[in-house]
Amino acid sequence: MSKTPVPTEYDDTRILGYDPLVPPALLQHEIKASAESLDVVIKGRYDSAQILKGNDDRCIVIVGPCSIHDPPQALEYGKRLKKLADELKDDLVIIMRAYLEKPRTTVGWKGLINDPDVDNSFDINRGLKISRQLYSDLTSVVGLPIGSEMLDTISPQYFSDFLSFGAIGARTTESQLHRELASGLSFPIGFKNGTDGGLAVALDAVQASSKGHHFMGVTKNGMAAITTTKGNDCCFIILRGGKKITNYDVESVKAAKEAIAKCTDPSIKLMVDCSHDNSRKDYRNQPQVLDSVAEQISNGEDSIIGVMIESNIHEGKQPMPPAGSGKEALKYGVSITDGCVSWETTVEMLTKLSQAVQTRRSLKKQKVSN
């Protein structure tokens, strides 16, 4: 009888190599979260949670570049945003979108962590260090709360102490790993509806993440461990549209509220993403989405607790730099991933949203007095 031949190499046959990765605890030791950072982070988390629980009538705004590819530009944007946030603080809790990783439909630049020099050098250890320093500067020097997407289950160990908000993208909302991750994070998490525009997976995700879980994870010392969580009661749904559909209008919000009412937790709140499929992937349509949301809020809608906006110093987007040229070949303040609205348009949009919150507040006062 012939035997099946045993290959000389049968494990890791498609792995080209392994390189040492700096442990989260070491990076946190090198770049510590200052008292100033922690004050900003904790306040951002508290304010967001109070809005989600209905104890604060302001709106949350997650606004900033689609992805960060140059820390100095991000700091300049952050300084502008901080000034605006202070001006509108009575109506809006503004959290800077500080995304370090990008999910790709196929392939492409994966973000500041994966390729910090935008030259295919993939110096991930350098990317981690640059990113943590940026988060430290944004929260301590600039004084802004920040948020990011939870794309994998390891990177939060490096940065979660700086975050006041997290999002789970449409491609990963259905992932059990990401639901387990969300159940243990110390800040509010928004789950985007599926890429088809349906709410079911996001509703399931919010409810699953509110419960405790046991799963395999990695400690801050870089050791594999069994992780036990208690559940996250500050999760919500982000309406981002779907293939060939939008879901930010009055009827879509009404349908979402009806779906939520049938859940075990009817208090789940909604945030509207002004970009992605709601803008039909054209950044110039983001103000139109914001206009609709502002009108709904002005009319008393209180299930919408905030918006997401992709914004940069200058509008639009630009192609990746030619091979070998790095970031030096790029235009200043322009996205290299999704198109963004300009700073000037951002100011107009947030001012309009602030006015809508004021109108809703006045409307409620009138109802109480009557």
UniProtKB/Swiss-Prot annotation:
Activity regulation reads: Inhibited by tyrosine.
For the biological process aspect of GO, one term held by this record is: chorismate biosynthetic process
User: What keywords were assigned to this record?
Assistant: Amino-acid biosynthesis, Aromatic amino acid biosynthesis, Transferase
Supply the Gene3D superfamilies for this chain. Answer: Aldolase class I
Task: Please provide, in alphabetical order, the Gene Ontology terms of the cellular component aspect for this entry.
Answer: cytoplasm
Q: What is the catalytic activity of this protein?
A: D-erythrose 4-phosphate + phosphoenolpyruvate + H2O = 7-phospho-2-dehydro-3-deoxy-D-arabino-heptonate + phosphate
Domain of life, source organism: Eukaryota
**Pfam families, alphabetized:** DAHP_synth_1
EC number of the protein: 2.5.1.54
Protein's pathway: Metabolic intermediate biosynthesis; chorismate biosynthesis; chorismate from D-erythrose 4-phosphate and phosphoenolpyruvate: step 1/7
SUPFAM superfamilies per UniProt: Aldolase
Q: Name one GO molecular function term.
A: 3-deoxy-7-phosphoheptulonate synthase activity
The UniProt entry, under NCBIfam families, shows:
aroFGH (TIGR00034), PRK12755.1 (NF009395)
Functionally, this protein is described as follows: Stereospecific condensation of phosphoenolpyruvate (PEP) and D-erythrose-4-phosphate (E4P) giving rise to 3-deoxy-D-arabino-heptulosonate-7-phosphate (DAHP).
Give the protein family: Belongs to the class-I DAHP synthase family.
| Protein's name according to its UniProt entry | Phospho-2-dehydro-3-deoxyheptonate aldolase, tyrosine-inhibited
Native species: Candida albicans (strain SC5314 / ATCC MYA-2876) (Yeast)
